[in-house]
A protein has these predicted regions:
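Surface-exposed intrinsically disordered loops and tails
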Residues: 87-102, 260-274, 507-524
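Carbohydrate-active enzyme catalytic cores, enriched for enzymes
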Residues: 233, 282-466, 627, 632
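Bacterial Sec-dependent signal peptides at the C-terminal "C-region" and cleavage site
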Residues: 21-30
Length: 632
């Protein structure tokens, strides 16, 4: 639903809504930390001293995970073969938006290789001592390394994620004792060279679908391989110069990652992106895996030096909307590059991640560990997934002695709003029950991973999704992702329509038709300035200035937003256009078609209903837009 006003100069809008140890030769002083890296193998995730504990867990609380791992390893082939490393073929594909040709930005098939399975077989060998598993792991590594080099020769990425290659490096470390020097060299030298080849650099070839994501992202692309490559090969006498370089560069990147994430967390908790599919998916692996491998290679637990990371479960808790119809599938208000099809919170790895937070922070921050335990116990899957096969043998199992908070303590928290500064998210709620009212407001983000052009946007949930983030990312080959879903028009924001204004850039397929060239009144990259935030047991008040985001077409774009507990909202906008002829629009998106009666709009979704009363401007025109042919 759009409220459109084309008067000159300034528009003022107000809406009330009711709802819901190795010493490196020749290192300098800055590399003194290298002296703490142990000389022996294994040293990645566990070492000679901690291995008995790992094995004891495998024979005790994690026995089921061990038995399942052994069964998988028994089914793996004796002679593993890799595939799908040939040249990428560009072709015509059909999408919801029509037919177009794939490009270097289009997702491609991953190389079929055996890095992850080699790590499993390496663990199986260490658990059982049976040489058949050692031989499987060795052959898998040799075959995979050859495939990595073939893929590079064909200018294609092995995988968007570094996971399987990190595990290949771990597998080498874990079976090192069982290999001859020649066997070690045959694996580690080309493996480390592959890691070097795929790093970006002057004069190097472009690689199709290579993930170069740095510390601001999930850090699961090719830069993340450096630490593990260096740690696996350091001091082995085969490629020492490259190993030392990787170790140093990887260590530097990982420390920058930890600082970036710790600083971004603030005093409330955040993790690089406000999109749960990322922050509750693969993003935590980067810091946890560095914590694990630093601990196993040096004996030092770094976690206490980064206290902000302990707070991430707090963001999960505030993002979480209890689902009355299916308690195992909590909801959230929808944000950024998540699909927005069900707005289901990404809890598939909730047990795994919360168990990690407990493992590393239970002594440094007992309260955060208790909250993590509370969320862990609500995870629908009470086990650790097998992406990182060593995880079940390092932590988890609920034997950590951390007492979760009671339901009453979680449901009756007196605080009704939280400002996650780094994410630019204000989360408001009347309680923490299925029938409570939930709301988000977006302003002032400094962490912009997978964030849209949506400053001053709000969403409302009461029994169901009432004021929503619209659009969906689809399968990453549709034009909707770039030209609607990510743009201001898909959000509950203000538009100032200047004719033929270039559309802001976003990722996704490029459309060369006229619809793909021009902005529809939205904002550009940047962050709004938060002017005020106050919360108490009666109301929450937010004021935010997004003027600068609209560029020269805008003289003022200030939104004041009030949540009157439990379920009334007031939205007041001051909007000024530099050109009086530029149209202005106030957007509100619903799941279903609303009913408009005079200046009142009513929208239903499930058991929820939103009443929207337009107060100002006096001559506002209310217009419904949507339905077949006007979905975007």
């Amino acid at each position: 639903m759009k409220t459109v006003q084309k008067r000159k100069l300034t528009v003022r809008l107000a809406v009330a809504a009711s709802a819901a140890c190795m010493v490196c030769m020749g290192t300098g002083q800055d590399d003194a930390w290298m002296a703490s890296i142990r000389r022996d193998h294994p040293r990645m995730f566990f070492n000679a001293e901690t291995w008995p504990q790992v094995k004891a867990r495998a024979e005790g609380p994690a026995r089921a995970a061990r038995d399942t791992l052994l069964k998988r390893c028994d089914k793996y082939p004796e002679k593993p073969v890799c595939s799908d490393y040939g040249p990428v073929e560009f072709r015509e594909v059909k999408t919801a938006g029509g037919t177009h040709k794939t490009t270097a930005a289009t997702p491609i098939k991953n190389v079929k290789e055996w890095g992850s399975q080699a790590a499993e077989c390496a663990l199986a060998w260490r658990f059982t001592g049976e040489r058949k598993y050692l031989e499987k792991a060795r052959r898998m590594l040799e075959s995979s390394v050859a495939a990595y080099h073939a893929a590079y020769a064909n200018r294609r990425a092995v995988n968007w994620y570094s996971t399987s290659r990190i595990l290949a490096l771990c597998a080498y470390d874990w079976i090192w004792e069982g290999l001859t020097p020649d066997e070690r060299k045959a694996i580690i030298v080309p493996l480390v060279q592959h890691v070097e080849d795929i790093q970006p650099g002057k004069g190097k070839p472009a690689i199709i679908r290579r993930d170069l994501g740095g510390i601001e992202s999930g850090f699961y692309g090719v830069p993340s391989l450096l630490w593990y490559s260096g740690l696996a090969s350091y001091g082995d006498g085969f490629c020492d110069n490259l190993a030392t370089s990787h170790l140093r560069r990887g260590h530097n990147l990982c420390l920058k990652l930890l600082k970036f994430r710790n600083d971004g967390a603030g005093d409330d908790g955040a993790l690089s992106s406000a999109v749960p599919g990322y922050s509750m998916g693969a993003y935590p692996w980067a810091h946890f895996n560095f914590f694990h491998t630093w601990l196993s290679s040096t004996g030092e637990n770094l976690a206490s030096k980064y206290p902000g990371l302990a707070l991430f479960p707090n963001w999960i808790y505030w993002t979480w909307i209890p689902n009355a119809s299916d308690p195992s599938m909590p909801l959230y208000c929808g944000f950024g590059d998540d699909p927005h099809t069900q707005n289901a919170l990404s809890v598939g790895r909730l047990y795994e991640h919360t168990a990690q937070y407990i493992h590393f922070f239970r002594e440094a921050n007992p309260a955060a560990a208790r909250l993590a335990a509370s969320l862990r116990d609500r995870a629908p899957a009470q086990y650790i997934l097998n992406t990182w096969p060593v995880y079940p043998f390092l932590f988890g199992g609920g034997d950590d002695g951390v007492k979760p908070y009671s339901d009453a303590e979680l449901e009756n928290l007196p605080l009704h709003a939280r400002h996650f500064e780094g994410l630019g998210q204000f989360i408001m709620r009347s309680g923490w029950k299925p029938d409570s009212t939930y709301c988000t407001f977006t302003a002032g983000a400094s962490l912009r991973q997978h964030k849209h052009y949506d400053e001053n946007n709000f969403t409302i949930y009461k029994h169901d999704f009432l004021a929503i983030d619209s659009g969906t990312r689809g399968v990453e080959t549709d034009w909707n992702l770039r030209y609607y879903y990510s743009q201001t028009i898909a959000h509950n924001c203000i538009l100032i329509r200047r004719p033929k204004e270039p559309i802001p850039a976003y990722w996704g397929p490029v459309y060369n038709g006229p619809e793909g060239k021009f902005n529809d009144g939205g904002m550009y990259k940047g962050s709004a300035k938060v002017l005020a935030f106050e919360t108490n047991d009666k109301f929450t008040y937010i004021a935010s200035d997004a003027t600068s985001l609209y560029g020269s077409k805008c003289t003022e774009a200030v939104r004041q937003f009030v949540h009157l507990l439990p379920d009334t909202f007031v939205v007041y906008d001051r909007v000024g256009a530099a050109n009086a002829n530029d149209g202005k629009a106030w957007l509100l998106h619903f799941v279903n078609e609303p009913r408009v009666d005079g200046r009142c709009t009513v929208a239903d979704c499930g058991k929820g209903r939103l009443f929207c009363e337009t107060i100002l401007p006096a001559d506002a025109k209310l217009e419904k837009i949507g339905g077949p042919g006007k979905e975007f």
